Design a protein with these regions (language model features):
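Short, surface-exposed coil-to-beta transition loops
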Residues: 94-96, 112, 122-127, 172-174, ...
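A general "mature secreted/periplasmic domain" signal
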Residues: 115-116, 126-133, 137-142
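Short aromatic loop motif centered on NTY/YTY
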Residues: 140-223, 228-231
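Bacterial N-terminal signal peptides
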Residues: 9-16
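Bacterial N-terminal signal peptides that target proteins for export
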Residues: 1-8
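Terminal domain-start segments
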Residues: 23-102
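Sec/Tat signal peptide C-region and signal peptidase I cleavage site
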Residues: 18-22
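Short beta-strand elements that form the blades of beta-propeller/WD-repeat-like
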Residues: 110-118, 186-192
Length: 231
């Protein structure tokens, strides 16, 4: 390869791998602020200094898995997904936290997060305060993708665009829970809908009929996050 061509190639690679410019980084920090502040219960064993180092590395290289070795010999990994407003943190490959920002928030309150904890060799899903309170007005954010949150109906497989979603009230959202069955722990996807009695859920039969029951079962999700079956 010609020396000049080699130099240009190295320069292009350096530009492609450079950290985000200041403005892009500030915007990324603003979007991820609720996640970067480390919500209660997320990686409590990690020191504040290690968390801060991990965050800085992840912000410098979004869409890339960054690593950090702590003094306690813990291997930490973090990945920021810009497109989905999602952050994944792994502790020594045994414990993984997935934080996903919801595309809605309650007026006057902080953005809502869904936190899922995956522990090897078992998968444990934690639903953490992402259902908005019924008596307050919701605010939908057109900048956050709706793909992970809106339920696909059998008649219409396409997810509404953000502009369409802003025009119509959000009436359904997915909730992932873990049930203990005879076959072991199984992750179950249910759809939650607001009602006058509070938040109720109805399992999607096609997803779980082989695991729990052929007929759908109804549940009520209380404000404290407790799931109760409606008999």
């Amino acid at each position: 390869m010609h020396p000049k061509s080699r130099y240009l190639l190295i320069l292009l690679l350096a530009l492609a791998c450079r950290p985000l410019v200041a403005q892009e980084r500030v915007e990324l920090e603003q979007l991820y602020q609720p996640i970067l502040e480390r919500p209660l219960g997320v990686a409590p064993a990690i020191s504040d200094s290690a968390w801060e180092q991990l965050i800085q590395k992840a912000l410098d290289a979004p869409e890339t898995t960054v690593t950090l070795q702590t003094k306690a010999q813990e291997s930490l990994e973090m990945r920021i997904d810009k497109a989905r407003l999602r952050c994944t943190i792994s502790v020594s490959g045994l414990l993984t936290y997935e934080l996903l920002r919801a595309p809605w928030r309650t007026q006057g309150e902080r953005p809502i997060l869904q936190i899922t904890t995956l522990e090897q060799p078992y998968r444990v899903s934690q639903l953490t305060a992402f259902l908005p309170k019924q008596e307050k007005q919701w605010e939908l954010d057109a900048t956050i993708p709706y793909t992970d949150w809106l339920i696909h109906s059998e008649e219409k497989e396409l997810v509404p665009s953000p502009s369409e979603a802003l025009l119509a009230p959000l009436t359904e959202m997915p909730v992932v829970l873990t049930f203990t069955t005879e076959q072991g722990r199984r992750k179950v996807r249910i759809s939650a809908t607001p009602s006058l009695e509070g938040w109720t859920t109805k399992e999607e039969t096609k997803r779980i009929k082989q695991l729990i029951s052929i007929s759908p079962q109804s549940y009520q999700l209380t404000r404290r996050g407790i799931l109760k079956r409606i008999k």
